[in-house]
Amino acid sequence: MLISKRRMIHALSYEVILLVIIAIALSFIFDVPLEVTGTLGIVMAVTSVFWNMIFNHFFEKFERKHQLERTVKIRILHAIGFEGGLMLVTIPMVAYAMNMSLWQAIVLDFGLTMCILVYTFIFQWCYDTIEKRLGYTPRHS
């Protein structure tokens, strides 16, 4: 199996929980209907998945062509390129859906990114704890 059941559960639970948190938080903070923030979250998540596939395809071609080693510097450039490219697409979405200026959308997107970093850490820690209690031991290949 290309993707294990465990990985699918992990990815789906991560995305669904994040989507619910963001949709509710944005709706509450900006007094925007939950349908708007929920739809925005779904569209942004789908966009992120497609951008991930496209960006990584071309990044890996670039990597092979230039025989780059995956150093910390390359990973930082990869992360900046990925997030920067994603922001070029999602900031106008945020501005439109939330009825705000591009500058406000940039600030909001940056704030969301910082919150998602914290969420990711907490989610991973909780997920690891749950797996440990269930007796799962990760195998490293």
Curated annotation (Swiss-Prot):
<keyword id="KW-1003">Cell membrane</keyword>
<dbReference type="GO" id="GO:0005886">
    <property type="term" value="C:plasma membrane"/>
</dbReference>
<feature type="transmembrane region" description="Helical">
    <location>
        <begin position="103"/>
        <end position="123"/>
    </location>
</feature>
<comment type="function">
    <text>Mediates the efflux of short-chain diamines when energized by an electrochemical gradient. Involved in resistance to the synthetic biocide chlorhexidine, a widely used antiseptic and disinfectant in both hospital and community settings. Interacts directly with chlorhexidine and mediates its efflux via an energy-dependent mechanism.</text>
</comment>
<feature type="transmembrane region" description="Helical">
    <location>
        <begin position="76"/>
        <end position="96"/>
    </location>
</feature>
<keyword id="KW-0472">Membrane</keyword>
<keyword id="KW-0997">Cell inner membrane</keyword>
<comment type="similarity">
    <text>Belongs to the proteobacterial antimicrobial compound efflux (PACE) (TC 2.A.117) family.</text>
</comment>
<dbReference type="InterPro" id="IPR007896">
    <property type="entry name" value="BTP_bacteria"/>
</dbReference>
<dbReference type="GO" id="GO:0015297">
    <property type="term" value="F:antiporter activity"/>
</dbReference>
<keyword id="KW-0346">Stress response</keyword>
<keyword id="KW-0813">Transport</keyword>
<dbReference type="Pfam" id="PF05232">
    <property type="entry name" value="BTP"/>
</dbReference>
<protein>
    <recommendedName>
        <fullName>Short-chain diamines transporter</fullName>
    </recommendedName>
</protein>
<keyword id="KW-1133">Transmembrane helix</keyword>
<feature type="transmembrane region" description="Helical">
    <location>
        <begin position="16"/>
        <end position="36"/>
    </location>
</feature>
<feature type="transmembrane region" description="Helical">
    <location>
        <begin position="39"/>
        <end position="59"/>
    </location>
</feature>
<keyword id="KW-0812">Transmembrane</keyword>
<keyword id="KW-0050">Antiport</keyword>
